[in-house]
């Protein structure tokens, strides 16, 4: 039987994040509870649930109550013997198939540390993600925080001229763009095909509230119709603006935390931690509803991907 207690939300910062009390995510949720969570996501963008010792099945059940699950492609970067989770999860741990930390020079680890760059999950997909739900099973002794930036608050702090400038702009997103920033450039032909750039609007509007946000990510490598140097400088300026400390919440993980965030109005990044220590965190992702921009498979896009 669904528990009817309404969750309580306690703001963490003036702009972003709330801690949630009065809800046990191991139990099926009533429609009123789901509606309260959706409303809170629109308002706070990041929700923190402490002391939620979920099984994988319970994690999946909670996710499905909020929307359809996006299939993860991360296992394609792992060796078969290192796959720990089904594709309903994104395994964003630093662990191999024996639950041991990857070696410092392991290719999967070097690709994964690109997550230390500010990004929005799945902005490199034609239909980008809506919510992400990350759960901690083990945490390192120090470091490993996840930081979140509120892109709606950042948009509202822009001057009118900048808002007008970016309103019509379309960016191209690819994981190859973000990995290039850290010097990771060795991709197979199959990976280059899979990571072809997709187009996303630079300004998004939340459908239920009408609130606008900067839709930005380290995956964004250029702006359609702009010269590359000018495009990247504008994207850098916007990222520096959006990640000022006033717009950012840094989450220090505890075992059995579940943190969910709205990718449509946030960026996030992981922080460093000792390479020899385990950080077992696993994520489910809720699919978005539609593309933000038309996809044009033209010669220019193909050239950017090469």
Model-found features: residue ranges?
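Fe(II)/2-oxoglutarate oxygenase catalytic core
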Residues: 2-260, 264-306
């Amino acid at each position: 039987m669904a528990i009817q207690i309404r969750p309580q939300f306690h703001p963490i910062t003036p702009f972003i994040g709330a801690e949630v009390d009065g809800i046990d995510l191991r139990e099926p949720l009533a429609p009123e509870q789901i509606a309260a969570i959706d409303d809170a996501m629109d308002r706070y963008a990041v929700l923190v649930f402490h002391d939620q010792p979920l099984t994988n099945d319970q994690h999946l059940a909670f996710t499905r109550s909020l929307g359809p699950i996006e299939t993860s492609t991360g296992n394609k970067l792992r060796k078969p013997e290192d796959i720990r989770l089904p594709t309903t999860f994104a395994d964003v741990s630093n662990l191999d198939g024996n639950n041991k930390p990857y070696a410092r020079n392991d290719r999967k680890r070097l690709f994964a540390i690109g997550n230390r760059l500010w990004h929005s999950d799945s902005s490199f997909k034609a239909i980008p993600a809506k919510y992400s739900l990350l759960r901690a099973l083990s945490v390192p002794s120090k470091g490993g925080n996840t930081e979140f930036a509120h892109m709606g608050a950042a948009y509202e702090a822009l001057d009118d001229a900048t808002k007008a400038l970016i309103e019509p702009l379309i960016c191209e997103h690819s994981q190859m763009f973000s990995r290039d920033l850290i010097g990771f450039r060795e991709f197979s032909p199959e990976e280059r095909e899979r990571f072809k750039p997709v187009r996303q609007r630079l300004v998004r509007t939340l459908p239920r509230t009408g609130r606008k946000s900067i839709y930005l990510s380290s995956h964004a490598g250029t702006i359609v119709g702009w010269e590359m140097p000018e495009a990247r400088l504008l994207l850098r300026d916007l990222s520096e603006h959006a990640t000022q400390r006033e717009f950012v919440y840094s989450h220090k993980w505890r075992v059995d935390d579940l943190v969910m965030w709205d990718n449509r109005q946030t960026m996030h990044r992981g922080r460093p931690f000792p390479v020899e220590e385990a950080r077992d965190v696993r994520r489910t992702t809720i699919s978005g509803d539609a593309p933000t921009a038309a996809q044009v498979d033209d010669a220019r896009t193909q050239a950017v991907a090469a």
